[in-house]
Amino acid sequence: MFGADPLVFPAVFAALYAAHEVGDHWLQTHGQACGKGAPGWSGRLLCARHVVTLTAVKAAAVTVVAVVLALPINPYAAATALAVDAISHYWADRRTTLLALADWLGRTVLPGKGEFARLGDGSAAPTGTGAYALDQSWHVGWLFAAALLASLGVA
């Protein structure tokens, strides 16, 4: 079935997580952070630029880990993993999409999730808001999935 080296998943996850922290917080520009959720092409372009930079940092981190640790990572699996992660990151960072998901979950299976997403003042302290917590947990969940995908096809 699927082959996987048991060291690939944790090493790739650690690389993706570290790169995510750097790319999402240090390398994202102020303009991207403030404008990526804006409607129209301006917001889409700012979000895309952020995700391209972030994905490049993640690709570099996975490559360094693979080379330094001599890990048998399938390049096609790694590329697929990075693409899936990039798409999920773009989707969430457009903001209205993640908020709509929280609202839908709040109406159907997780009462209060939409209200949680609106906790705090994003302009005063964006890292202390419900939206930020949901955003980052979404990203980390997809890092997990990406690390698993990158582990496939290795025997």
Residues of each region from the PLM?
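Hydrophobic alpha-helical transmembrane segments
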Residues: 1-155
